[in-house]
Amino acid sequence: MSSEFIEAGAADRVRILSEALPYLQQFAGRTVVVKYGGAAMKQEELKEAVMRDIVFLACVGMRPVVVHGGGPEINAWLGRVGIEPQFHNGLRVTDADTMEVVEMVLVGRVNKDIVSRINTTGGRAVGFCGTDGRLVLARPHDQEGIGFVGEVNSVNSEVIEPLLERGYIPVISSVAADENGQSFNINADTVAGEIAAALNAEKLILLTDTRGILEDPKRPESLIPRLNIPQSRELIAQGIVGGGMIPKVDCCIRSLAQGVRAAHIIDGRIPHALLLEIFTDAGIGTMIVGSGYHEAHQPWQ
């Protein structure tokens, strides 16, 4: 068939698949931990795109793990029961009543919805919270006056490794308990980073509501596509990385220091952001790499 009769759209799809081949080969059998939150949880079109991306990762031989929060839905349910959401230094103040709502929403509603959507899309998802099987052991946060807000004390990866080996997709909510069984609300970025480290993951990917790390927050086109750990720390010291981006970058740095090969901060408002970041030469966000990182196919060099 002559090339002029080939539909342009079909040719584009084949070109994209060809571009993805080195990445498909490199990442087959590797674990990728995705923190799912932000706008990607609020818009139906974006929800569907994320679920399709996650199932795609599993279908091409990767081992996706999903860790999620659910801030907007928590706020909505707190409003229904007459509790005013309160925050201190970016952390949700979590008294006993708030903790009960957080646990109900994250474990009983958001988690089950994600599991159902992945399964409906053709994946095999299994829902967890950090308390299940003592997957995540919590401890109280160092900051005083914020109630039942926790940090990750340890991760028991043996709970989910057998599932990954059999092709299941773990979906984990960021609620965990301490040694005494007290439940804590933990930042989902933190949980994702620690689980990625425990699984020796290839990638940690944070879906956010920003393009990535910007040289100038007022200029979306100033995206920094790739950084190492010292460069990331320097951007924090210079104030270029500030506000809510600091804990995300810190989370990435901690996971890299514990053996994760690359951490990505990407814009979850873009449909199919996961696939665009992992399987295209240009990517769409910021990738932070550790000192020993080596990529067989390095598009930015």
Swiss-Prot record:
GO cellular component, one term: cytoplasm
Enzyme Commission number: 2.7.2.8
Keywords: Amino-acid biosynthesis, Arginine biosynthesis, ATP-binding, Cytoplasm, Kinase, Nucleotide-binding, Transferase
Organism: Synechococcus elongatus (strain ATCC 33912 / PCC 7942 / FACHB-805)
Catalysis performed (reactions): N-acetyl-L-glutamate + ATP = N-acetyl-L-glutamyl 5-phosphate + ADP
Residues the record marks as site: Transition state stabilizer: K35, K248
Protein name per its UniProtKB record: Acetylglutamate kinase
CDD domains, per the entry: AAK_NAGK-C
Coarse class of the protein's main subcellular location: cytoplasm
InterPro entries xrefs: AceGlu_kinase-like_sf (IPR036393), AcgluKinase_fam (IPR004662), ArgB (IPR037528), Asp/Glu/Uridylate_kinase (IPR001048), Glu/AcGlu_kinase (IPR001057), NAGK-C (IPR041727)
